[in-house]
Amino acid sequence: MTQLDSRTEATTTRAFDQPRAEAAVRELLLAIGEDPDRGGLRDTPARVARAYREIFAGLYTDPDAVLNTMFDEDHDELVLIKEIPLYSTCEHHLVSFHGVAHVGYIPGRDGRVTGLSKIARLVDLYAKRPQVQERLTSQIADALVKRLGPRGVLVVVEAEHLCMAMRGVRKPGAVTTTSAVRGQFKTDAASRAEALDLILRK
């Protein structure tokens, strides 16, 4: 199986190794001093492996296959989808971070747009990988630039990281905000301000 860093896009199909994942979970249980053969834990390696297969499903999906539907709507104004729920996994501690993504773009001169559900699926695809929030935000923006050729893209992600809430500094409720700005939103302050105002407006 080709090993690829999650920062790069897969050019081949990866496969989840269920037996290897189960064996690794069993070893982890032993390492923390547990008995993986006791009743409550006997099926845990298989359950965790199946959960990881779902949680990291974005590793096995091509972003180009998600943004595969375009519509020639001759639309040249902002398209903004707010409050897209996301659940991801911090690659440093393998614990969850969760929150929302706001994704906006201004179609290119050809007026091409994609389906609204495709944007939500794109967020899911990149969230379902071992991640850092900064990279997640940029990957969503760059995928839209690549596939849609828009005049501008703005992505804002707000998330709470359980690695800060349940361990370490233990600051539950702290929210991290990241943004990725491309094209017209980067060069035109008025366009950027309009999009950010709509995002912040409840």
Swiss-Prot record:
Pathway as given in its UniProt record: Cofactor biosynthesis; 7,8-dihydroneopterin triphosphate biosynthesis; 7,8-dihydroneopterin triphosphate from GTP: step 1/1
UniProt-listed GO biological process terms: one-carbon metabolic process; tetrahydrobiopterin biosynthetic process; tetrahydrofolate biosynthetic process
UniProt keyword annotations, A-Z: GTP-binding, Hydrolase, Metal-binding, Nucleotide-binding, One-carbon metabolism, Zinc
GO terms, molecular function: GTP binding; GTP cyclohydrolase I activity; zinc ion binding
Top-level taxonomic group: Bacteria
Identification of the protein by name: GTP cyclohydrolase 1
Quaternary assembly: Homomer.
Binding site for Zn(2+): C90, H93, C163
Family according to the record: Belongs to the GTP cyclohydrolase I family.
Its EC number(s): 3.5.4.16
